[in-house]
Amino acid sequence: MTPGPQAPHLREPAPRALLASASVAVALAAADTYVVVLALTDMMAGVGVGIDALQRATPIISGFLLGYVAVLPLIGRLADLTSRQRVLLSCLAVFVVGSIVTALASDLGVLVAGRVIQGVGGGGLVPATLAIVADLWPADRRGLPLGIVGAVQELGSVLGPLLGALLLAVADWRWIFWLNALAGVVLTAVVVRTGGGMPWRLRAGPLALAVVGLAVLTLALAAPEALTTSVALGGPFVPFGSATSVLLTPIGVLGLVLTSGALLWWLASAREVLRRADLLGAVLIGT
């Protein structure tokens, strides 16, 4: 009998290094909760919102908090059903995407959407990291690593405004989120390294579709206004105000369709996990 294909060999994870990298990711996400406090007026000006319309900018902060809190029970349950490292890396990827969308935002709707995506990714890092601690340490030795995770989360919340002030002193507010994205990419590589390798095989189809979709979305967000608005079918509409949305133009819609297709492809491959009846309960608790 011919033996089946062998699974790729994974190194044993390095518990302390993995805890350190995951804890830094948790601190980064926690810092992002309030990193925008001092940058709020600059961000409003960057997306064409005047200081007299401050109430319209509150979703920049509350949107992040909403995503952060709502995803906690869902990610906690997903971490029970599949690889903890896989969930952690997925949340880091979502956080990076949200940071890039926020950095490229040219109107309030896109900015708020980017912050919500950031919150979803950042909030998911907490239960995923706690699940990793439960896997790597026996019950009688979990007190210290769990305390470290809780401490760095609070430390990140305290340092967020200070880090934002330091960056604003030397750069534009968008660099806050570009550095977030860069830090997320570096932490992803470190988690893969310290966690023993990639916890799954990347499939070429959905990966290529996601890369193309994100590239088109990036072009739509970063392109000159003439490319996204001065074209046929580029109807301007934004539910947040009178500004023109670059996502509701042909190039923006194409990027959304491609990215959504990649997401649906991935969901189809994860249908066994998604079929679990109690997963719906976790979603309802989060909402």
Model-derived features: positions:
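Transmembrane-helix bundle of Major Facilitator Superfamily
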Residues: 2-195
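Hydrophobic transmembrane-helix bundles of small-molecule transporters
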Residues: 174-287
